[in-house]
Structures are given as structure tokens and as C-alpha cells.
């Protein structure tokens, strides 16, 4: 297929400013045209949701749902109408049900889930089964609004374990929310509503980062001054390690920076902050900026070996966000939590507000309690999520909370971590398939790399393969987005631009989670072929194009 280079350049000029998630639609349009012309299916590796789902906890959920419906009909059954479940004796009724329907899908796990709460936490048998039964029926508002009592405890077990914490010392409270994206919205709104973050304040973003963090910060109602903390470390070969050098972390010593936002492991680099940087970051904040607020988004933590979250290593400073979407394949379920230690900087900053601002907040929350000053920040997030006045209807839907609990206990019961190792192996295998086609770029797997995405910096590749003259040629003759547009137009392959995540301008993101294994071989082949096509055109010119005097100067083009 012949690519109209001029039309691609015109298209980039028109849409190049868009978010990568909107730019993706333009790339899909090009890829679909290629699909029609060459008869090859489009490959969209721009999407982040995986192509696997956790089956057994879903089976347990739907089997338990049938039990719950029978419980409502036991109370009252009149044609299509039923009653509400009753607590007394419900555990024994469940045991009888599980014996009668012993072969029902997911029943073995379901019985283990029920027994987990009883054996691990000492839950009252009837109270535990009733909470789950009433919740899966969804006939009541969530009470408490932040999270169902026993459900919160089992979900906390999962969160603390996967985030590298200690259940014996963790004091985290959880707020169940509609996925990580809802958590982001709620958190920023509450920081502003409670006046511990104000319009125009200085915040730090650890980049590359999930694009909406950048876009939210620039919205007119926030208009934050952004300080970027770059994962700019490179190894001896000049390759990105996607770690944060000390000089970048030192930026947080500035006490005028009120908030730091981090995605860890990162998106799109998919690398967790290493232990050395975690320790250094903690020292900088505690010594130089003791009232810094941190929001860490750790959705990819389960794909990393021995992951440690800032919500566990720096609990006083850190508000944690976790989404179940990627690990369990539940982007459509909208399952996430906000986690905050009971002693935290957010509470203390609210207490330190001047009296005139405290009066405003007392008025805001006075309908909720006679002691509005004492409302913890996490409960303020809950109220703010429903404009305070609708606080009594706040909270994640109760059936969603049940599915969240089932996923959590399923993972906790998997002592051999069979499911976790499966998901890790899928991503790592697909990464190897890509690099089998790009041998000069092959990377070593280390324990900080998740391989959920892969970020390739085309300029680093160009320098490693052909030297600085080829880098200069690319800079002089191509727009950074041109590679992606040609990849879509010629091969029907959709990837995202790393620059849209505040990554290196010439970097591209490949999602390793959402296509079939064999598709990644094809993607690797296409990337390599297009790259070599650029190199062939450069070689054909037969002249030295480099205007760069030393390798050091080329570094300015790398980000």
C-alpha cells in the first residue's frame, strides 16, 4: 500500500495536539482503510484493557447471585415479585444450598470465600453471608457509604498484600469507587473543596504518566503550575531505565510543591520505582517537604515482582488508588479503591487551615455531623463525591462491592499465585515476541519491569543502530508522530504516542495485554520494517547530515 506522506503530514498538523486517546481514533480510521485495502485485520495495540478475564471468581459471583435470589423468594414470592433477604439462619441455608448445588460453576471457590471471612476474620456467620447476600441483590444503599463493613476488611487484606504492606501494622481505610478514573476525579475535587490545594498551586507529576493526570491539572478550574519529575535515567548504553535520578527527586524538596502525582508502575513505561529511589524520595520529603501530599496510582502493581507501593512505604503522605481493571480483566465492571492511612497529612493540613477557611468547611459539612471539624479526609471524599447533600446515597453499588470482595479473596486464596504468574507470563511472553523481531532493542527483564506496556524511544533506537547522523536525519525530515501514522496507514497497526504521556517525544507505546500472542510478532515485524525503511531513505541520500558536534548535544532531543 502506498502511503501519501503529504496527507499524513497535513493530518498530523490538524490533530497532533490531541490527547493520545483521541489521537487513537484518527489512527484507527487510517488502520481501517489499510485493513480494507490489504485484507489484513487491524491490530489495535493502543488499548490498555487485557484480553483475559478472571473466570472462577465470576462464576462464584453468579452462582451466589442465584442463591441470593432464592433467599428473597423465600421471604416473599408473588409471580415476578420477591422480598428482601433475611439474616437469621442464612449461613445454614447457604450451606444446604452449596450441598444441593455442589457442581454449580464456582461453588468450590464460593464456599472458600465464605469460610475465609469466618476463619480469617472471625466474622459472625450469619452477618457475613447476609452482608454479601443483601449486597448482591442491591436492594439497599451502601451502608456505610464508604464501604460495606466486612467487605472492606477482606478487600483490605488484598490491597495490603499486593501493595507490599503488613496487615499487622496497616491502618488504611478504604473507599470503594467506580474504578481508578472515578478515584482521580473524587480526589482532585476534594483536595480543592477542602482548600488544601488551590487553583494555581504548584504540583509535581512523575512523568511519563497516564495522560489524564496532565490534562486534569491544566483544566481552568485547577490551572495548576506543573513541575515535571522525569524518569530520565539511562544505562551505560544510553537506553532508558525509566527510573528517577536523584536530581529529579530533589525537585520535591521545594516546599511550595503541594502535591505529587505518581503512577507506579508507570504508564506507559511499565516500570516500578526501584528501592533506592523509594528510599531517597522518602528522605527528601520527610526532611525538606514534610507536608507534601502524594497520590499514587498503582493499578499495575500486581504485574511487578515484589511490588512496594508508596502507600505502604510512606503511608502518612500517600493517598493510594488501586483499580481491579487490568489484573482481573474488569474494565467494564468499574472496580477500584481509594486507600488512606488513618494518620495522614491530608487530615493534618485540614486541621491547620486558617479559621476563616475552617468556617467555610464547617458550613459545607454541617448537615453530616455536629462535629464537622473532625470528619476524616477520606470521609470528606465520600461526601464530596455526591456534592455533600447526597452523602446518604454515596458509595459504590453493592453488587460491585461483592464482586470486588470475591476477586480479592480469590487472589488471597491462591497461595501458589498461579493466576498472578499466568498474567505476568502472558505480558512477558508477548514482549519477547516483539523483541524477537527487533533484536538490537532487546531488553533484560528485571523485577521492576511489568511488561504490561512497552515504550520504545525511536531516537534511542536510531542512535544505537546507526549513530547520531541518522538521529539528525529523523529530526530534520519527520514529525515525531509520523511513524505512528505510517504504521497505521501501511500496516493497519495502532499504537499510541509516548509524548502524549509526557514521555520522550519520539517514543511509542505498545500495549502487550490486549491482543493475541501471534499479533505481537506481526507488530514487531511492522515496526522493524518501517524503521528500516526510514534508514534506507537516509542512506540513499549519501551525504552527512549531522550538524551535532557531540553525542552529548543529542540528549536534548531525547525528551
Language model: regions and residue ranges:
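N-terminal glycine-rich, Lys/His-bearing helix-loop that initiates the first secondary-structure elements
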Residues: 1-78
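PLP-dependent enzyme catalytic core of the Aspartate aminotransferase-like
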Residues: 2, 11-21, 64-136, 140-169, ...
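Short, solvent-exposed loop/turn segments at secondary-structure junctions
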Residues: 48-53, 181-183, 209-211, 265-268, ...
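Conserved glycine-rich beta-strand-loop-beta hairpin in the small C-terminal domain of fold type I
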Residues: 399-410, 417-435, 443-471, 501
Amino acid at each position: 500500500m502506498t502511503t501519501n506522506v503529504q496527507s499524513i503530514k497535513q493530518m498530523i498538523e490538524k490533530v497532533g495536539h490531541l490527547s493520545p486517546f483521541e489521537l487513537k481514533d484518527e489512527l484507527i480510521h487510517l488502520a481501517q482503510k489499510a485493513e480494507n485495502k490489504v485484507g489484513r485485520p487491524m491490530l489495535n495495540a493502543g488499548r490498555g484493557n487485557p484480553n483475559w478475564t478472571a473466570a472462577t471468581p465470576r462464576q462464584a459471583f453468579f452462582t451466589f447471585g442465584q442463591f441470593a435470589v432464592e433467599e428473597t423468594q423465600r421471604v416473599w414470592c408473588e409471580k415476578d415479585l420477591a422480598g428482601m433477604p433475611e439474616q437469621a439462619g442464612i449461613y445454614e441455608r447457604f450451606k444446604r444450598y452449596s450441598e444441593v448445588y455442589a457442581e454449580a460453576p464456582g461453588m468450590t471457590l464460593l464456599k472458600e470465600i465464605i469460610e475465609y471471612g469466618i476463619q480469617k476474620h472471625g466474622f459472625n456467620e450469619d452477618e457475613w453471608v447476609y452482608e454479601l447476600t443483601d449486597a448482591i441483590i442491591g436492594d439497599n444503599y451502601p451502608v456505610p457509604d464508604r464501604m460495606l463493613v466486612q467487605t472492606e476488611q477482606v478487600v483490605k487484606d488484598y490491597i495490603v498484600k499486593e501493595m507490599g504492606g503488613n496487615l499487622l501494622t496497616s491502618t488504611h481505610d478504604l473507599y470503594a469507587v467506580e474504578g481508578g478514573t472515578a478515584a482521580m476525579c473524587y480526589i482532585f475535587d476534594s483536595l480543592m473543596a477542602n482548600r488544601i490545594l488551590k487553583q494555581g498551586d504548584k504540583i509535581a507529576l512523575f512523568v511519563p504518566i497516564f495522560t489524564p493526570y496532565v490534562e486534569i491539572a491544566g483544566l481552568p478550574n485547577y490551572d495548576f503550575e506543573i513541575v515535571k519529575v522525569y524518569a530520565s535515567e539511562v544505562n551505560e548504553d544510553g537506553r532508558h531505565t525509566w527510573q528517577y535520578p536523584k536530581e529529579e527527586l530533589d525537585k520535591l524538596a521545594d516546599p511550595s510543591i503541594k502535591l505529587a502525582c505518581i503512577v507506579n508502575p508507570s504508564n506507559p513505561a511499565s516500570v516500578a520505582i526501584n528501592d533506592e529511589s523509594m528510599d531517597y524520595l522518602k528522605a527528601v520529603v520527610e526532611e525538606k517537604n514534610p507536608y507534601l501530599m502524594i497520590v499514587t496510582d498503582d493499578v499495575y502493581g500486581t504485574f511487578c515482582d515484589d511490588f512496594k507501593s508508596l502507600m505502604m512505604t510512606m503511608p502518612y503522605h500517600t493517598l493510594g488508588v488501586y483499580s481491579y481493571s487490568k489484573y482481573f480483566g474488569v474494565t467494564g465492571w468499574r472496580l477500584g479503591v481509594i486507600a488512606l492511612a488513618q494518620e495522614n497529612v491530608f487530615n493534618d493540613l485540614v486541621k491547620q487551615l486558617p479559621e476563616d477557611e475552617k468556617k467555610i468547611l464547617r458550613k459545607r459539612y454541617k448537615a453530616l455531623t455536629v462535629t464537622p471539624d473532625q470528619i476524616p479526609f477520606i470521609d470528606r471524599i465520600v461526601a464530596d463525591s455526591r456534592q455533600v447533600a447526597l452523602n446518604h446515597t454515596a458509595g459504590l453499588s453493592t453488587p460491585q462491592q461483592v464482586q470486588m470482595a470475591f476477586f480479592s479473596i480469590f487472589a488471597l486464596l491462591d497461595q501458589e499465585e498461579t493466576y498472578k504468574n499466568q498474567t505476568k507470563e502472558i505480558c512477558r511472553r508477548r514482549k519477547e515476541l516483539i523483541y524477537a523481531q527487533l533484536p538490537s532493542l532487546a531488553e533484560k527483564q528485571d523485577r521492576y519491569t511489568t511488561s504490561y506496556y512497552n515504550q520504545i524511544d525511536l531516537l534511542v533506537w536510531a542512535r544505537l543502530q546507526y549513530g547520531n547522523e541518522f538521529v539528525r536525519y529523523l529530526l530534520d525530515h519527520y514529525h515525531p508522530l509520523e511513524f505512528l501514522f505510517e504504521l497505521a496507514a501501511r500496516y493497519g497497526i495502532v499504537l499510541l504516542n509516548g509524548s502524549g504521556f509526557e514521555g520522550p517525544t519520539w517514543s511509542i507505546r505498545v500495549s502487550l495485554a490486549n491482543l493475541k500472542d501471534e499479533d505481537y510478532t506481526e507488530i514487531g515485524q511492522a515496526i522493524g520494517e518501517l524503521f528500516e525503511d526510514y534508514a534506507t531513505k537516509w542512506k540513499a541520500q549519501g551525504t552527512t547530515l549531522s550538524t551535532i558536534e557531540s553525542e552529548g548535544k543529542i540528549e536534548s532531543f531525547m525528551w
